[in-house]
Amino acid sequence: MATVNYNDGLLVRLQSPEYAIEYLNEALNEGSQEVFMMALRDVAKAKGISQIAKETNLNRESMYRMLSEKGNPNLSSLHQILNSLGLTLAIEKKENAA
């Protein structure tokens, strides 16, 4: 029986938009920029960094830097990346907020 590397399996699962959305939302809920950037990088890898760079007109090397744990993309770049992934940012009221 063939075994699948965890990272390879994750990249396959992240090709599902529903799974990718849940994955990114969980990373956001962690409250850590590093965790979110790692998750966004995983989702981007599932689509292909080169493909996203081509669609967004962002330099591939810059994409890797932006999507690193210490990456700090500006809002415009983040929007372009998410748009290329078929996703968008949304602001919602917290359930327990007054």
Residue ranges: model-predicted function:
Residues N57, S76, A97-A98:
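Long, contiguous binding/interaction regions
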Residues L67:
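DNA major-groove recognition helix of helix-turn-helix
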Residues M1-A39:
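N-terminal flexible/basic segments that precede or flank functional cores
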Residues L40, I49, L78:
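Generic structural marker for isolated residues within well-ordered, non-membrane alpha-helices
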